[in-house]
Amino acid sequence: MNKLYIGNLNESVTPADLEKVFAEHKISYSGQFLVKSGYAFVDCPDEHWAMKAIETFSGKVELQGKRLEIEHSVPKKQRSRKIQIRNIPPQLRWEVLDSLLAQYGTVENCEQVNTESETAVVNVTYSNREQTRQAIMKLNGHQLENHALKVSYIPDEQIAQGPENGRRGGFGSRGQPRQGSPVAAGAPAKQQQVDIPLRLLVPTQYVGAIIGKEGATIRNITKQTQSKIDVHRKENAGAAEKAISVHSTPEGCSSACKMILEIMHKEAKDTKTADEVPLKILAHNNFVGRLIGKEGRNLKKVEQDTETKITISSLQDLTLYNPERTITVKGAIENCCRAEQEIMKKVREAYENDVAAMSLQSHLIPGLNLAAVGLFPASSSAVPPPPSSVTGAAPYGSFMQAPEQEMVQVFIPAQAVGAIIGKKGQHIKQLSRFASASIKIAPPETPDSKVRMVVITGPPEAQFKAQGRIYGKLKEENFFGPKEEVKLETHIRVPASAAGRVIGKGGKTVNELQNLTAAEVVVPRDQTPDENDQVIVKIIGHFYASQMAQRKIRDILAQVKQQHQKGQSNQAQARRK
């Protein structure tokens, strides 16, 4: 996606004219400008420069009296299902964007692109060409909160590599697995290790002191702490605070944090600009609930142990472009640094648990993008990459069959039903389309029921998307407190004959399941099987814990089914002999 199309050019424009205008705006390019009649092409060194050129020039810069129009150059054969939407209002909520995109078809993927502009950019994949064509026609120029959206095709790599016999993900032309695709059983797994950075928010007036003359101070911090430090000076121009990302070991991050905090305190004292400079840590919203703990216990313990005062920014401050919460720590420098260590320890634990849950999902849900689910906006540095392979994943041929339909019952607060349904049923319809699942809300069991049952029917990917959105909606609409994690009760039905396998000898399997997933798993005793000879398994926990437990139980059921089929096959062979 580094090749650019430059349109709306005068016939007299030459390569030298374009070279000059690119140089004036300090936009890097590679190779020569290929100028045609009224348009031109050029390559950029990487995707970052391509996006910067689009943001800098398109519709903003004139050349010989005509405004340049720049977008990604996409060959016709690659104009399929992928588009890029630019100039999205930064304060827009994911739900509003999803609602808009869903009007034109089924969104398979929605990833946010990192840019230096104040507005947001997303790459969207629809399920077919016609939906994509409609989205471009309707959305290009569409006014959204006083911002005119700009939409263009981007290359569809799957089309470029050929249809692959209708396979999804799959193998390249030389038979090698592409990234994110399932691999043959027994193939060595290479899990890319990604460390979560420490993200600090510092007052803009202290950024210069942190960097130092000609970068000397920040180089010294980097050298002493063996870390990589990014100061995001260009983002949010004019903002009172700037973000700093520290990439290192936990110890290196903490050492860098202490040095930065000491510099800010000294600068505040020397300039007499502030009596107190609190430590501000940025953490992705998905980790904050576990940092706070049940009834705020985890956070209170950190405060008591470190003798600090800790506050967390409101959920209302979250936007499409800002999925992070601000954790403000007040106290002595040493105490603030101790608090940072405890806070980041909790955040890293939550991150590692989520990575484990996603790795478990990956062979069942190939290619699933969490930004599309609305759980991890893709711009977040906390988002782990999709694993390139999973140990013990089934051979690719097993995915040629249609995924098995699953039925799950999720219990939500009764007062939340209206929020899930939406005005005139719009939200539940959009959710159903988005997840490609059947979603129905059962009538209350009694007039004063405090919970309602949501019945979701669909394959594993649909379950993941639909349940994820329901958890997110309940938190977003404040049905759970700001210091409370969303934990729901979920029921799945299993054959009565397989219930013993879920429990295990002396409860061993169910205990292991609870330890592994952090969910509460209960198989009620003395159940009467229903008309399909099935019994209920109850799962209680936060989203990832619940998902992990569901998948592990489905794995157990699949093994039972496989053994049963194998036994029947052996009996049939014995009879034939």
Curated annotation (Swiss-Prot):
Sequence segments annotated as region (Disordered): 160-190
Places the protein is found: Nucleus; Cytoplasm; Cytoplasm, Perinuclear region; Cytoplasm, P-body
Domain (RRM): residue spans on this chain: 2-75, 81-156
Tissue: Expressed in fetal development and neonatal life, but is undetectable in adult tissues (at protein level). Expressed in embryonic neurons, including in hippocampal (at protein level) and cortical neurons. Also expressed in transformed tissue cultured cell lines derived form adult tissues (at protein level).
InterPro entries in UniProt: IGF2BP1_RRM1, IGF2BP1_RRM2, KH_dom, KH_dom_type_1, KH_dom_type_1_sf, Nucleotide-bd_a/b_plait_sf, RBD_domain_sf, RRM_dom
Domain KH as annotated: residue spans: 195-260, 276-343, 405-470, 487-553
Keywords for the protein's UniProt record, in alphabetical order: Cell projection, Cytoplasm, mRNA transport, Nucleus, Phosphoprotein, Repeat, RNA-binding, Synapse, Translation regulation, Transport
Residues modified to Phosphoserine: S12, S73, S181
GO cellular component: axon; CRD-mediated mRNA stability complex; cytoplasm; cytoplasmic stress granule; cytosol; dendrite; dendritic spine; filopodium
DNA-binding among keywords: no
Region described as Sufficient for nuclear export: 312-323, 485-495
Biological process, per Gene Ontology: CRD-mediated mRNA stabilization; dendrite arborization; mRNA transport; negative regulation of nuclear-transcribed mRNA catabolic process, deadenylation-dependent decay; negative regulation of translation; nervous system development; neuronal stem cell population maintenance; pallium cell proliferation in forebrain
Principal cellular location given in the protein's record: nucleus
Modification note: Phosphorylated at Ser-181 by mTORC2 cotranslationally, promoting binding to the 3'-UTR of IGF2 mRNA.
Top-rank taxon: Eukaryota
Molecular function per GO: mRNA 3'-UTR binding; mRNA 5'-UTR binding; mRNA binding; N6-methyladenosine-containing RNA reader activity; translation regulator activity
Modified residues (Phosphothreonine): T528
Gene3D superfamilies hit by this protein: 3.30.310.210, 3.30.70.330, K Homology domain, type 1
Family: Belongs to the RRM IMP/VICKZ family.
Assembly notes: Can form homodimers and heterodimers with IGF2BP1 and IGF2BP3. Component of the coding region determinant (CRD)-mediated complex, composed of DHX9, HNRNPU, IGF2BP1, SYNCRIP and YBX1. Identification in a mRNP complex, at least composed of DHX9, DDX3X, ELAVL1, HNRNPU, IGF2BP1, ILF3, PABPC1, PCBP2, PTBP2, STAU1, STAU2, SYNCRIP and YBX1. Associates with mRNP complex. Interacts with FMR1. Component of a multisubunit autoregulatory ribonucleoprotein complex (ARC), at least composed of IGF2BP1, PABPC1 and CSDE1.
Role description: RNA-binding factor that recruits target transcripts to cytoplasmic protein-RNA complexes (mRNPs). This transcript 'caging' into mRNPs allows mRNA transport and transient storage. It also modulates the rate and location at which target transcripts encounter the translational apparatus and shields them from endonuclease attacks or microRNA-mediated degradation. Preferentially binds to N6-methyladenosine (m6A)-containing mRNAs and increases their stability.
Domain notes: Domains KH3 and KH4 are the major RNA-binding modules, although KH1 and KH2 may also contribute. KH1 and KH2, and possibly KH3 and KH4, promote the formation of higher ordered protein-RNA complexes, which may be essential for IGF2BP1 cytoplasmic retention. KH domains are required for RNA-dependent homo- and heterooligomerization and for localization to stress granules. KH3 and KH4 mediate association with the cytoskeleton. Two nuclear export signals (NES) have been identified in KH2 and KH4 domains, respectively. Only KH2 NES is XPO1-dependent.
Protein name (database record): Insulin-like growth factor 2 mRNA-binding protein 1
